[in-house]
Amino acid sequence: VAPSDSDVEDPTPPARARYVAIITDGNGRWAEQRGLSVTDGHRAGAENVKARLRDAVDLGVEELTIYAFSTENWSRSLEEVKALVKMFAEYIDRETPELHEEGVRLRFVGRRTSPVPDEIVRRMEWAEQLTAGNDRITFFIPFNYGGRAEIVDAARAFTGTTEEEFRKLLYAPEMHDPELVIRTSGEQRLSNYLLWQTAYSEFVSREELWPDFDRAALEAALAEFARRRRRFGGRVA
């Protein structure tokens, strides 16, 4: 089968990745290695999110997506889930005003129905409304998100015939397809993350556990992306 018209090779490596998604793996292992609680690991991970977001701005990233909480995460222990949800609420309350001042647009991605608490939904809506006019970087935060769930939800509402019509039914239709997906802790799987959007994304696996993933690691991942030749189903010339 020949490639479609959209399967055209980009003949030159891009100077930088503008649209980046990160799977933040390793908070629990990081905490265990240090004799800390899992909650401590998640707190360290949350602090690292803020630091890498600011690095992404400096490095010319226009859209950054960082997995916060998946639909599968509800199956973890009640204690861990409660701690994660509480931390997420605190993060929105504390960080949104500062991120707004820095020109960050916040966009939460995922189902906003039960079991997500109403108070979390209200916080997400507040943060989105406050930062809606910002354009320095868009920070997509998948919460209660699953790639299969997103596709199923879109399919239920779909009455069109084209991919573009289908895309408009995704949780964040304005999101560009990530050019680069980074996963920490050495793992090499998508874990139900942005399944529609990552069809042609480049994948970079880093050995660092997420709390240890620093600016140098981010720069190294971006440099690896810049060395690659993206073919989109075509052949190298």
Language model features by range: what are they?
Residues 1-237:
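Flexible, compositionally biased loop and terminal segments
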